[in-house]
Amino acid sequence: MNNSDLIIIGSGPGGYRAAHFAATNGLSVVIIEAKEAGGTCLNRGCIPTKTLCRNAEVVETVRKAAAFGAEASLGAIDFAKVMERKDQVVSQLRSGIELLMQTPGITFVKGTASFKDAHTVAVGDELYTAKNIIIATGSEAKMPPIEGINVPGVVTSTELLALTKLPRRLCIIGAGVIGMEFASIFSSLGSEVKVIEFLKECLPTLDSDIAKRLRQAISKRGVDFSMQSGVKSIREENAEDGSRQLVVTFEKKGKASEVSADIVLVATGRRAVVEGLNLEAAGIECGRTGIVVDDNFQTNVEGVYAIGDVNGRCMLAHAATFQGLHVVRRILGKEDNIRFDIMPSAIFTTPEAASVGKSEDNLKDAGTEYVCRKGFYRSNGKALAMDATDGMIKLFVTPEDGRILGCHAYGAHSSDIIQEVAALMNKDATVSELADIIHTHPTLSEVLHDISL
């Protein structure tokens, strides 16, 4: 029997950060990982995707080089090198986390964890006990019940990130964050991309006006969108040249259509990873979207917590990180002032989009009075200098005192601009206080400052 102060199941951005923070504050920690250190985010999610986003940005820059006086020819995309660079970035960061897990006080265990009781976890034949346990097992792709969903070539983001050949034609089912990022990446790399989405607009958590403008910007680069369309089936057949292809049948307003592709990416959502944990043995309640937790991320079992995607509250890597830090502080008997109601997020398309707080849709649905202030990149000096004038910021404030309710944007470096708003919202700042902050000239952040005046 191995006893420690804290057991953490999962070494993603929630688990490994919590482990390091706990150990540096004097707790003995056992962290259990079934796959690779760093979890889905590092190995099969955020980091490899953002690496490919950067590759795609470079390709787009070369395509526009003549406008900057540089006569450059793009030539063929060396997809093997693209993927090699992605693997190198992931490997380097994984090595860093593995080193971090050697911090005194941390015991890193490879294997699959399974509850024996509320405070005992088995990994193979070894038993580990602790007063406090954090479940941080993340999420996995959710496959919808579509005919032909198991046909070879129908993949999730995990398999797409492991491709060895650039697909000539890529069909993406779902226009959420994952679908939109891959649409942007693969269209830049040269694939013919088709996106099929059931909803009226892409990116449902983003302000619908911003989402529409972003979709239109990506459409101009050749991505074909079919919105309000439901996929009916996927089948495999031989093309006219004898090659194998996938045919996706979808329906829009009662009219059936088909699109052919070499690869079909299913990006219709994710679900909590709880299989094999044997939660029943610990009496832990699990709901439709994940493990049920309170506002301190504690389950119905005292001393057992669930953070990140596995609790289904907010499927963002940084949400997992800060939930983990909050839990460790609670275990240590310390307070914090983390505002989980202020959660910035970003979509790394080209151009990128980002948000924090309420959207105009949220405010209208809730019947909240607000003032919307809009700013456009096209009138900003830095945006013109960068040839990045396609962008917009929407800032929502209360009419009576100008308190900031939210900000949604798309355009170059919008994720950085949104972080400024997140900092202000954490302090309940008003738009007049934003107006008093000196902004460097020339910067894209001046778009935000201009609409505060």
Task: Identify the residue ranges that each predicted region occupies.
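FAD-site-proximal beta/loop scaffold in flavoenzymes
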Residues: 150-167, 258-331
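Hydrophobic "anchor" residues
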Residues: 48, 121, 272, 299, ...
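Short hydrophobic core segments
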Residues: 7-9, 113, 128-138, 173, ...
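Glycine-rich dinucleotide-binding loop and its adjacent helix/turn
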Residues: 46, 137-192, 196, 224-225, ...
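Glycine-rich flavin
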Residues: 2-4, 20-27, 32-166, 199-203, ...
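Flexible, glycine-rich terminal cap/loop adjacent to redox cofactors
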Residues: 7-14, 18-35, 40, 47, ...
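A Rossmann-like FAD-binding core segment of flavoenzymes
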Residues: 107-110, 114-122, 190-295, 365
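Beta1/beta-strand and adjacent pyrophosphate-binding region of the FAD-binding site
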Residues: 1-12, 166-176
